[in-house]
Amino acid sequence: MRRSVVEQDEKVAAVAAYNGAWAGAGWLSRLWWFPILALAMALRFYGLTAAAIWGDEGSSLLLSEYAVGDLWFHAAHDVHPPLYFFMLRGWIELFGDGIWSIRSMSALPGVVVVGLGVWLTRQLSTQRAAVLAGVLLALMPTAVRYSQEVRMYSLLGVWLLAATLALVYWVRQPERSRCLVAYVLLMAAGFYTHYFTALCVLVHWAWLGVLCTSQRPGERLILRRQWWLANVTIVLLYLPWLPNLLGLVQHVDELKVGGDVGWEEPVSLLSVPSMIWQFLLQDEGLGIWAPLFWLFPLLLLGVVGVTAWRDRERYRPASLLALFFLLPLLLVYGVSFISPVFIERYLTVYALGLPILVAIAIDRLPSRLSLPGAALFVLLVGVELLGLKNNFTVDEHDQFNGPVEFVNRNYQEDDRIVLSDMLWYLSYVYYDQTDAQLQLYTPPKADGTPTRPNAYGFGTLVDQDGGRIYLDRLSDLPADTRRVWLISSNEQPDEFAPLPADWRLISQQDGGGARARLYVLCRGPAPLRPEGCR
């Protein structure tokens, strides 16, 4: 139902008063966005180095070490396209590979994402809505989290939000071809950064389809030659990489062997509300009181749905944002019943549509509903603050780098270092300061099936050196080995069990869920045995 004339007059008066107050502030009114970006930067750089590098980050760093030609080859065997890794390689050459430096390459785009979100909101709605959206975006826990990892997700947010902004400009003024050129370049960059960019293409086509319902036949942008030419150009720009993508699709079974895909939990009825909690609270919410677990996500989905349904503005801004948030979420959820890919980090960019749309919904409320609008804003900010608390609750003294540094301090020449899992291996390489050849424990299954990684997924980072890295049995260690470091989970069962009877535990160090253990091998005549055997 359309708002009454009285409600619209109330809204116009409120917005006029708000904008008048800003105009009276003089030059300060032009810097209203600065505190928002300052908040976004403070949150994304806070505790940036508190958590240790984990497996996925380690894989980014190993990929970035390759020469340009080799990087292209290995990225073709990884589960992500190469652009981020090329950029990370250049960043490290300029600023080094210290943990603050490499994570800054994600934190800075994370701040840019907030700025783009504010800009997009201002183009779609009022300055008040842009301020509200800016605060919610700056605080959004999922955006903060993935702005603090050496991965491509914050960079992807820059490409996709900027592309959406360029599309909005073009829709308003179709004669501005440069907006469409910018759109093409940004979407191509998105495709070279992450395969889920395809979801953004669907969002944009769907929005133009919605606009068709209110456009005369000759004005329908979705049928414009320029639009089709732009999409064809994106495909042409992607052609150099397309054979690699097709090759990857044909080797899904190899990716499953290495645990790169196929590890995700099957989806259920709880998955969608749980994902919304994950975006905002950094917790799946499964331990929350059941009515609250359902009510809060349903409230947000209701706000999204009602705002989009009541959207009667010419360019349907609420419809664009609802599609940006809901279409990828629900599509990936549906696909996950066949092949589970319902993962927070793959959708975190699209989650940015939620706070923007909530801000616009609050801004559109008439004055008589300002109190419920304020309550919704405070509620969402409160949940986000709890999510930030969960993000920043990190014990710096219980991190994976602790056991690695323990090994570095106590390492002796000719010691062997064996790791039980690929993710431990990828993290360990970053912190390792020894001259040892790290080895990955790959015991065959009970039926004799090998567990060695292959040339796809994480395996592409080590497979070329597999002969030196893979260790199928502890008994395969050289006969003259005297000391062995075992790196594994600190939980049972022991991934190296059973250990040879002549191994003696000398010391160990836990941290970040891992355990480093030093064993001496008590072999040969007693006088020749290493210290610890006597």
Summary of predicted features, one role per range:
Residues 2-9:
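N-terminal intrinsically disordered, acidic low-complexity segments at the extreme N-terminus
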Residues 14-533:
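Terminal, non-globular segments
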